[in-house]
Amino acid sequence: MHKDDILKELKKVLPEEIIKVDEPLKRYTYTQTGGNADFYLSPTTNEQVQAINHLARMNNIPVTYLGNGSNIIIREGGIRGIVLSLLSMDYIKVEDNVIIAGSGAAIIDVSRKARDYSLTGLEFACGIPGSIGGAVFMNAGAYGGEVRDCIEHAVCVNERGEIVTLTRDELELGYRSSIVQKQHLVVLEASFNLAPGNQEEIQSVMDDLTNRRETKQPLEYPSCGSVFQRPPGHFAGKLIQDSELQGHRIGGVEVSKKHAGFMVNVDNGTATDYEDLIHHVQNVVKEKFDVELHPEVRIIGDHPEEHQ
């Protein structure tokens, strides 16, 4: 379908105010890089998500789901078809010891809400800069905790546009992986089963984790968070540090001098700079230690030369 025809079809099923055409995606990524989306849609209801999925499936339009852009690199060529953002679905509800959060809610905010209600179990998430949808997608974790530890179930949309509810076991949450990734599901909502706790003790744990994060991580620059998964028996940051790569720079992106597991945008870096630096680090670590580093960050979109 031509873009004008797609736009006409979108306007039949969605309010115009949630449709953006040729939208710069660097506005929505922590790295501040990325080309344009043909269509950037920000639905506010499950029904709108289903309508978008149905329209896309019937017309063979690719759909890319975007969380809050914290652990993703989008290439300068942008993304064809539809980019679907669920950030407007950011509600947080508390029912007894269960917190229910929309896909677009920041997991930091959900962690704070748990604290406010003296519920323990989400302290580990107090510094994770991601949305609930993204956190479930990759089983986000930090400081010894992860989503798998406390999630009860997630409500998702499958590729056929059907709404399904998956239990913790059915989500198959592993190290930075889930069935959501494997089956191309879209998380609409997640419920977390927490335990009653002492609010002061919960706050104390969160303060400690926040201090550790601020002390060790390069929060003063744009970045995509931890770049590589932890290889078995090793720490990615230690391997990179021992390869003397801290401070190594390609274009405007460098391996952080503060934490070797991060790459920071210090001077108008591009997605290409990030990708080239990632490949360079992988090659050096492989050569020095014979260890394969696999990206934790998602790299998506067209290369610039594909969209000229």
Swiss-Prot record:
GO CC terms: cytosol
Residues annotated as transmembrane: none
Residues forming the catalytic site: 176, 226 (proton donor), 296
Cofactor(s) listed in the protein's UniProt record: FAD
Keywords linked to the UniProt accession: Cell cycle, Cell division, Cell shape, Cell wall biogenesis/degradation, Cytoplasm, FAD, Flavoprotein, NADP, Oxidoreductase, Peptidoglycan synthesis
Alphabetized SUPFAM superfamilies for the sequence: FAD-binding/transporter-associated domain-like, Uridine diphospho-N-Acetylenolpyruvylglucosamine reductase, MurB, C-terminal domain
Record InterPro entries: FAD-bd_PCMH, FAD-bd_PCMH-like_sf, FAD-bd_PCMH_sub1, FAD-bd_PCMH_sub2, MurB, MurB_C, MurB_C_sf, Oxid_FAD_bind_N
Cleaved signal peptide residues: none
Presence of the UniProt keyword NADP in the record: yes
GO BP term (any one): regulation of cell shape
Reactions catalysed according to its record: UDP-N-acetyl-alpha-D-muramate + NADP(+) = UDP-N-acetyl-3-O-(1-carboxyvinyl)-alpha-D-glucosamine + NADPH + H(+)
Domain FAD-binding PCMH-type, chain residue ranges per copy: 33-197
Subcellular location: Cytoplasm
Pathway of action: Cell wall biogenesis; peptidoglycan biosynthesis
Molecular functions (GO terms): FAD binding; UDP-N-acetylmuramate dehydrogenase activity
Enzyme Commission number(s) from the entry: 1.3.1.98
Role noted for this protein: Cell wall formation.
Family the UniProt entry places it in: Belongs to the MurB family.
Protein name, UniProt field: UDP-N-acetylenolpyruvoylglucosamine reductase
Organism: Staphylococcus carnosus (strain TM300)
Lineage of the organism: Bacteria, Bacillati, Bacillota, Bacilli, Bacillales
